Amino acid sequence: MATLPAEPSAGPAAGGEAVAAAAATEEEEEEARQLLQTLQAAEGEAAAAAGAGAGAAAAGAEGPGSPGVPGSPPEAASEPPTGLRFSPEQVACVCEALLQAGHAGRLSRFLGALPPAERLRGSDPVLRARALVAFQRGEYAELYRLLESRPFPAAHHAFLQDLYLRARYHEAERARGRALGAVDKYRLRKKFPLPKTIWDGEETVYCFKERSRAALKACYRGNRYPTPDEKRRLATLTGLSLTQVSNWFKNRRQRDRTGAGGGAPCKSESDGNPTTEDESSRSPEDLERGAAPVSAEAAAQGSIFLAGTGPPAPCPASSSILVNGSFLAASGSPAVLLNGGPVIINGLALGEASSLGPLLLTGGGGAPPPQPSPQGASETKTSLVLDPQTGEVRLEEAQSEAPETKGAQVAAPGPALGEEVLGPLAQVVPGPPTAATFPLPPGPVPAVAAPQVVPLSPPPGYPTGLSPTSPLLNLPQVVPTSQVVTLPQAVGPLQLLAAGPGSPVKVAAAAGPANVHLINSGVGVTALQLPSATAPGNFLLANPVSGSPIVTGVALQQGKIILTATFPTSMLVSQVLPPAPGLALPLKPETAISVPEGGLPVAPSPALPEAHALGTLSAQQPPPAAATTSSTSLPFSPDSPGLLPNFPAPPPEGLMLSPAAVPVWSAGLELSAGTEGLLEAEKGLGTQAPHTVLRLPDPDPEGLLLGATAGGEVDEGLEAEAKVLTQLQSVPVEEPLEL
């Protein structure tokens, strides 16, 4: 053993440069021999002692002559490669030690020092060492060949699989010139599956192998709610974490509940996502009780239901309504069911119903549902009530015996009985303050000698985006004051757009069946309350009729202006005796009532006092007229931008009222010359046959030009005088004129 360090010192003393060159060329072999000597000393003391004695005897025989022989160092340097012979076990032990230490460079040099026969005859450690060296050198084809050459023990599968996948990733990155993402790596794993030599063939689905899944299923069949100790034992047995085991049981129970309820089955296994909830701390009874409320809340959230007395009626397919200047047809399943046919208002599908209760919305926020009273004497109802005057939202609870709160009610959990909580409510816009309403008795409106003049102002928020080419003009929310419109019983179903919960729109009681429908187009859902005619509320709905409603508005078709029944939303509707038979009503020229700018003559009723009129009221005597007639004008402010804004001049054709599209009633439509765009409705209240007069004001050069039929001559001298333009017949106007 002492000769090994003496030989290097003797070489330099001799001054031979050949020794230094030989030592440089055989550096790797010397390092490999030192590793082998260390390994031999560690294997056994007996074998190491025998080897040391043989080496000492050889050194003693060569020791006396070595200093005097100058050629002895080259011989000693050349003898170890030929004289040293290593067994396969020794080579495998060195390779295993270097593999565990992670010295890939030293392992590469050691394998290079081995004879070719030893490398080719290598055992499992030698093959794994060669695979690691091939991976470090970038020889991926050699790595794949080595891994597929023979099966490897299962203890080394994880290391070899990681080596194989890393080689695939590096090879793809070298080919693409960029780093791989998670999706790219997943595709590579699907494209290049693991070789069978380093894989047991057991497929892993969501981090769960077949054996682990079988053990979990066996435990689940015996106990669906294992204790924490049982979960830990399962995690140790299957090689999974405690979180994965808990998630698997939770997902399996949820799948069983979903499958029992007829829902779609979920995926096969859990995805292994971590969770902080441990269901083992909850009892089975608590979990079973919590399953049904969760499913019920999931079905109820996000839905709007309107309580009614009977089952929902079939929805008419032809229901439609004019909203914001366009027709909206109700097609498909409605989003809100009002126990009847769907009607779409501002993107919200509503419906018709004979008797409707208050609007009920489910409360959100994830709060638990209110528990029933243990006595069972009365059931508390929690509601959010919006006060239109103060704009506050009150949370109240009332007994079932108490009358229902008017307006929209939102069902939500709240505090104790009688407690009020003020808080904001999302997407709830309070309507205008409640105005005074004066319902009229059934029958004709008595004539009044002196009408009242009500100056008006344009209502805020009226849509002004109507283009001149718009085919439909909607005229809702024009007059905020109360008006009176008399309709005969022959009028078909009519739907009116209300402004909100504060609009005084009511339908007076009548002997015959009523056919006027009031539909609210307010922004907030709290303004939707359509109770029966006998129930108190903001609106009164009397015997609605199913079918296609008659839409209000103004349409331009084929050069003709068709004026439909356009009423302000703030009005009182009453029915009178049926009119004379026949749709054609005679026309007669009549002098228009002159009113100041912005004024309107209104025929008041005994139930309409002056104290509740809007604006400044002034009396004005009308011009001489027949004793049996009285004129009542529906006001339209001249400065209102929403009334026929910039309407183009159509070709000179007849201005007609379409009997097929609008109802016919005894009130006539007329345009007075006193104000711009003033629409007057004249009602015949005497013994003469009812008539309809249509008049136009004195327009500017950009205004409406409505003439007679084609070929008629225009009279230039009739600009300041209102004339009769057309009759309610299918014949053209006989007298040509122009404004």
Swiss-Prot record:
Q: Where is the composition biased (Low complexity)?
A: 1-24, 34-61, 74-83, 617-646
CDD domains hit by this protein = homeodomain (cd00086)
Write out the GO cellular component annotations: chromatin; cytosol; Golgi apparatus; intracellular membrane-bounded organelle; nucleoplasm; nucleus; transcription regulator complex
Instruction: Give the linked disease.
Output: Branchiootorenal syndrome 2: A syndrome characterized by branchial cleft fistulas or cysts, sensorineural and/or conductive hearing loss, pre-auricular pits, structural defects of the outer, middle or inner ear, and renal malformations.
Summary of subunit composition and partner proteins: Probably binds DNA dimer. Interacts with EYA3, and probably EYA1 and EYA2.
Q: What role does it play?
A: Transcription factor that is thought to be involved in regulation of organogenesis. May be involved in determination and maintenance of retina formation. Binds a 5'-GGTGTCAG-3' motif present in the ARE regulatory element of ATP1A1. Binds a 5'-TCA[AG][AG]TTNC-3' motif present in the MEF3 element in the myogenin promoter, and in the IGFBP5 promoter. Thought to be regulated by association with Dach and Eya proteins, and seems to be coactivated by EYA1, EYA2 and EYA3.
Per the record, which residues fall in region Disordered?
Answer: 1-84, 251-294, 361-381, 617-650
Q: Where in the cell is it found?
A: Cytoplasm; Nucleus
Compositional bias (Basic and acidic residues) = 279-289
What Gene Ontology terms describe what this protein does at the molecular function level? DNA-binding transcription activator activity, RNA polymerase II-specific; DNA-binding transcription factor activity, RNA polymerase II-specific; RNA polymerase II cis-regulatory region sequence-specific DNA binding
Q: What family is it from?
A: Belongs to the SIX/Sine oculis homeobox family.
Q: Which PROSITE patterns match?
A: HOMEOBOX_1, HOMEOBOX_2
Q: Which organism is it from?
A: Homo sapiens
Instruction: Show the InterPro entries listed in the entry.
Output: HD (IPR001356), Homeobox_CS (IPR017970), Homeodomain-like_sf (IPR009057), SIX1_SD (IPR031701)
Protein known as: Homeobox protein SIX5
**Do the record's keywords include Transcription?**
yes
Tissue expr: Expressed in adult but not in fetal eyes. Found in corneal epithelium and endothelium, lens epithelium, ciliary body epithelia, cellular layers of the retina and the sclera.
Q: What happens upon changing T552M?
A: In BOR2; affects Eya1 binding and the ability to activate gene transcription
Gene Ontology process terms (BP):
lens development in camera-type eye; Leydig cell proliferation; negative regulation of DNA-templated transcription; negative regulation of skeletal muscle satellite cell proliferation; regulation of transcription by RNA polymerase II; spermatid development
